[in-house]
Amino acid sequence: QKLCARPSGTWSSGNCRNNNACRNFCIKLEKSRHGSCNIPFPSNKCICYFPC
């Protein structure tokens, strides 16, 4: 199943530096399949992955 990336709507900890925390946020709070930190300049974002 294809997953589509979407910035977390609940991440409020500023720059994302902890993949495990981001993944837990996405799975538990946003009901996504996966989550990880995306590192584009100028800020790191927590990205959640949902079924498309």
From Swiss-Prot:
Keywords: Antimicrobial, Disulfide bond, Fungicide. It holds the Pfam family Gamma-thionin. It comes from the Eukaryota. Gene3D superfamilies: Knottin, scorpion toxin-like. One of its GO terms (biological process) is killing of cells of another organism. Possesses antifungal activity sensitive to inorganic cations. Forms oligomers in its native state. This is Defensin-like protein 2B. It comes from Sinapis alba.
